[in-house]
């Protein structure tokens, strides 16, 4: 039996009301092997570098076409989002979890501007006729989701490609704002402290110089006009000590008042959003499934 989108959204709403293990987030009963969800390997050429990851495909019980969420990791990628990805897949969303160029086995040299290009290329791939047909993706319902530096990747990628339906920013890092307020030495120290050494890169200085060269262009406020007419989800932790809140508040003030398309969530959590992941997943699924 196919699950219509309106019934699915109602189930998500029930979850949001407090029943965290019900509705769209429960594991289904599969009477036939053909109904099973599946995990596919991702190997996508992004400007000449192969980026690897996974594609989580919902059960065939969910109606086609389905929305797609591409989850971009932060810097340097230690904080995983597999739990949220699987919850979104259980709700009938195709989920792509890539590793950026130069990170966690993907080819190429890591740069922040390269991550933006990866997000652009991933969105274009998801919206292509071949991919959308293979996975049952609605090419008009592709969302970019980014945590921390991944937020920088997705908001800037969405600003460049108006076909992207919406963005979800989870404790996003406006690295352009931060770079404009730090010395090169302090910016380098910040990145080293966050795990720069685990990334494949030409040099530490190359990563820092890339940020400094693109700092102004990457500022979140510069993306507000482009993304403001689309769906925007912003989630932050009250105890976040990694990224400043000022540029996030500035972005939010620039978005037109539209509570149906623009969703602001605050959680009693730190930068990783640990401890509130289930509530976050429910809110994010509701945001993506809302027409």
Language-model features and meaning:
Residues 22-62:
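N-terminal cap/lid segment of alpha/beta-hydrolase-fold proteins
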Residues 66, 72-77:
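Active-site glycine-rich loops that stabilize anionic/oxyanionic intermediates
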Residues 75-87, 246:
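The serine-hydrolase catalytic nucleophile loop
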Residues 89-107:
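Conserved alpha/beta-hydrolase
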Residues 110-136:
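Alpha/beta-hydrolase active-site loop
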Residues 134-148:
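Alpha/beta-hydrolase fold nucleophile elbow
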Residues 156-207:
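Hydrolase active-site cap/lid region
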Residues 207-282:
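Serine-hydrolase catalytic core
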């Amino acid at each position: 039996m196919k699950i219509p989108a309106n019934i699915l959204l109602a189930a998500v709403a029930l979850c949001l009301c407090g029943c965290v293990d019900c509705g769209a987030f429960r594991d289904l009963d599969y009477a036939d092997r053909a109904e099973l969800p599946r995990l596919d390997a991702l190997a996508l050429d992004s400007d000449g570098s192969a980026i690897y990851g996974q594609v989580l495909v919902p059960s065939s019980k969910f109606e086609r076409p389905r929305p797609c969420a591409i989850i971009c990791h932060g810097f340097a990628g230690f904080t995983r989002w597999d739990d949220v990805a699987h919850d979104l897949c259980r709700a009938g969303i195709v989920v792509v979890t890539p590793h950026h160029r130069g990170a966690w086995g993907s080819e190429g040299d890591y740069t922040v501007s390269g991550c933006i290009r990866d997000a652009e290329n991933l969105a274009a791939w998801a919206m292509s006729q071949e991919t959308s047909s293979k996975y049952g993706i609605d090419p008009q319902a592709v969302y970019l989701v980014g945590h921390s530096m991944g937020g920088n990747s997705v908001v800037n990628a969405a600003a460049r490609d108006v076909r992207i339906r919406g963005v979800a920013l989870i404790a996003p890092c406006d690295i352009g704002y931060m770079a404009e307020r730090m010395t090169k030495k302090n910016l380098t120290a910040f990145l080293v402290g966050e795990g720069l050494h685990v990334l494949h890169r030409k040099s530490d200085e190359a990563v820092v110089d890339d940020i400094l060269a693109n700092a102004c262009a990457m500022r979140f406020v510069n993306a507000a006009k482009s993304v403001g007419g689309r769906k925007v989800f912003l989630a932050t932790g009250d105890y976040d000590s990694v990224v400043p809140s000022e540029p996030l508040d500035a972005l939010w003030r620039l978005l037109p008042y539209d509570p149906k398309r623009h969703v602001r969530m605050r959680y009693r959590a730190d930068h990783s959003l640990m401890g509130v992941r289930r509530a976050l997943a429910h809110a994010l699924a509701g945001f993506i499934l809302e027409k």
